[in-house]
Amino acid sequence: MGCNILMGTDSSAIGKELCSNDVVRKIHLTGSTEVGRILMRQCSDQIKKVSLELGGNAPFIVFDDADIDEAVAGAMISNYINADQTCVCANRMYVQENIYEEFSKKLAEATRAMKVGNGFDDGVTTGPLIDQQALEKVEEHIEDAVSKGASILS
């Protein structure tokens, strides 16, 4: 069984071709629910096999028996790998109440220690967001969370 990963600037044209071409027997997408709906609809004419991994709703859970330092290290990777622009990044954290203060303090310290910049520069630990749209999406998520009672740790 083979796998092909296609990249290009006209994703709509690529998607339409893959979904309508008889040579392609199955489509797999890891991506947004919006794009998943489009591809599923386009594949339905041929009753093409489709598997979809959608939404990126990955919680990071810390129980009270966890090694806090290891949990913080894991949270940093899970939240900030590739500037938090992958489908496997955690989008929320659940921490048991009796360890919340210690965990959140250490997580805030680790986050403050990050250096954002060009990945080729010394000391840089994470790159910038990919574009203005990505920045605006992050800002919207922050505003939404705060409006629902979340606190920003600094």
What do the PLM-derived regions correspond to, one by one?
Residues 26, 32-154:
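ALDH superfamily catalytic-core signature
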Residues 16-17, 140:
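Surface-exposed charged/polar residues within alpha-helices that form helix-capping/stabilizing sites
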Residues 1, 19-26:
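Short, surface-exposed connector motifs at secondary-structure boundaries
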Residues 15-16, 72:
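Short hydrophobic/charged patches on amphipathic alpha-helices used for structural packing
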Residues 1-15:
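PLP-dependent aminotransferase-like
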Residues 16, 22, 126-128:
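Glycine-rich NAD(P)-binding loop of Rossmann-like domains
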